[in-house]
Amino acid sequence: MAFQGTSRTLTQQSSAATSDDLQKILFSPEAIKKMATECDLGRHHWMRADNAISVRPLVPEVTHGRIASFFKSGYDVGELCSKGYMSVPQVLCAVTRTVSTDAEGSLRIYLADLGDKELSPIDGQCVSLHNHDLPALVSFQPTYDCPMETVGNRKRCFAVVIERHGYIGYTGTTASVCSNWQARFSSKNNNYTHIAAGKTLVLPFNRLAEQTKPSAVARLLKSQLNNIESSQYLLTNAKINQNARSESEELNVESPPAAIGSSSASRSEAFRPQVVNGL
């Protein structure tokens, strides 16, 4: 027999008041602060020797409990069709190194389910990055929605796991990982197409790329040196100041405009001071 019921969204299944309650749970100042401090959403997480394994849930524990209670209360009175699911379409991690390229070490990053005691990668979605491969972008796509339940003493949800290997002699931060995602919550769930974890190696940022002429740095340094030399002539005698001012006036006399294409015009353009990005 074919199913003849109606499919309703979360907002349709609950009243406006309960929908507002859910919004307050997700976007209250406390919830936003917890997402930053407990989950490192949009923040840089430093991988150090004393933090070789990092497990970051995608939902704070307090927020998880409140969301689960919201769905359970609606489910118990028949307003919602389930006790709630967490859906994460994609997790994107930007990874950069904070040591030189010759440092021997690597990172292992994957997405796990806190309901799994072994914290195994979900559907084998795991990426290994050697230090000299960085920077890189890593992406994960869960193939199912996670039930909002408690397993033992663990609040079940997705988590980003980062393992640091090697880096002998480097006790400080060797890499920085910035993760971003958007968690969604619904009373309905689904399964999704399996997609392998994505790894995109990124070229290091070239701070001088916007300068087309190779002598831009030399011109900048020369202009700075000229400014330093001129600042050394601090004269206190009024008569000498007058002479210095007259010399300055002679130097500032405008010369006739050079013809376009002449060697003097090209030299004038070549020695115009420029600001180099990053210096």
Swiss-Prot record:
Pfam families with a match to the protein in the record: 3A
Region annotation (Disordered) ranges: 246-279
Family: Belongs to the cucumovirus movement protein family.
InterPro entries hit by this protein: MPV
Annotated transmembrane regions: none
The protein's name: Movement protein
Cell location: Host cell junction, Host plasmodesma
Domain of life: Viruses
Function, in words: Transports viral genome to neighboring plant cells directly through plasmosdesmata, without any budding. The movement protein allows efficient cell to cell propagation, by bypassing the host cell wall barrier. Acts by forming a tubular structure at the host plasmodesmata, enlarging it enough to allow free passage of virion capsids.
The entry's keywords: Host cell junction, Transport, Viral movement protein
UniProt keyword annotation of Transport present: yes
An example Gene Ontology biological process: transport of virus in host, cell to cell
